[in-house]
Every structure is written in structure tokens, then in C-alpha cells.
Amino acid sequence: MRRWLRSILVLLVCTLSVGAQAEDMLMVRSRAQFEESMSALQEAISAQGYTLSRVQRVDIGLSESGFKTDKYRAVFFGKPEEIRTLSARYPELIPYIPLQIVIFAEGDETLLVAANPMHLRADYADAELGAVFARWEQDMRTIMEQVRKAE
């Protein structure tokens, strides 16, 4: 009986830890084609009050490495004044800003993937930054959900 309970406990802990790790990434799948999803992503970013910084093609390097993909982009965005302020106050945040969402075609659908900004909270005890990370997470979820709903 004791062994059985221990096994259940180990299984429960493993299940919970996998769920916690999954929250490090935000991901949605859109039924829309890549072009429509890319357009919806740019509109959703703007609607949330962010400025599109740049769109970087990732597929070129992948193709040169032998992978077959023709629609793979990293979309960078942020609020310019916020980026300047945070970069000056917290230079160690520079690698994480501007925010980014990766968008790529998979068959007839499009996937969007991003690192959850809340994972940064573990490294910063500052309550002000915690609020910023929470807002970024909510905004990214909203942006990605708008793209998911786009047809």
C-alpha cells in the first residue's frame, strides 16, 4: 500500500512539473494560411498598442541547413519608450526585448510560438517588473488568440 501511494505521488509530481514547464511557452494554432495569419498578427500587435520592430526571415538559414520550410518568421515588437526605459534601468533585460513571436506554416495551418514573459519573474524580485511581465504575458495571449480566431 505504501509503495502504491509513493508511486502515485511520484506520478503526480511528474505530471505537475510537465504542466509547469509547458507554461514557459505560449502557443496557438491558426487554421488560416500563413499569409492571412501574418497579416492578422501584425494587426493584433498594433491593436494592443505595440509597434512592429522588424520581421526576420528564419527560413533562409534553415533551408541552407537542409530543412524544407518556406514560411518561418520571427516577429519583433514592443513599445519604444518602454523598451528604452527598461533597457536603461535593467540592461540585463536587453536580450529579451523587444518581445517576439515566431510564426510558421505547418501544412494548411499556421503556428505561433513565444516564450512566456512570466518565466523572467523568477530572476527579478522587483514588483514593478513583475507587473510588466504579467502585462506582457496577457498582451501576448490576447495577440495570439486574435490570430487564432482569424480566418
Where would I find each of the regions flagged by the language model?
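Active-site-proximal beta-strand/loop segments in catalytic clefts of secreted hydrolases
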Residues: 31, 78, 115
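Positively charged n-region of N-terminal signal peptides that target proteins for export
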Residues: 1-6
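Terminal, regulation- and interaction-focused segments at domain boundaries
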Residues: 21-53, 145
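Bacterial N-terminal signal peptides
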Residues: 7-17
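Beta-strand/loop substructures that line and gate deep hydrophobic ligand-binding cavities in soluble
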Residues: 100-126
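C-terminal partner/receptor-binding element of secreted or periplasmic proteins
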Residues: 118-151
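Stable alpha-helical elements in mature extracytoplasmic
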Residues: 37, 41, 54, 58, ...
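Compact, glycine-rich, soluble single-domain proteins
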Residues: 46, 50-99
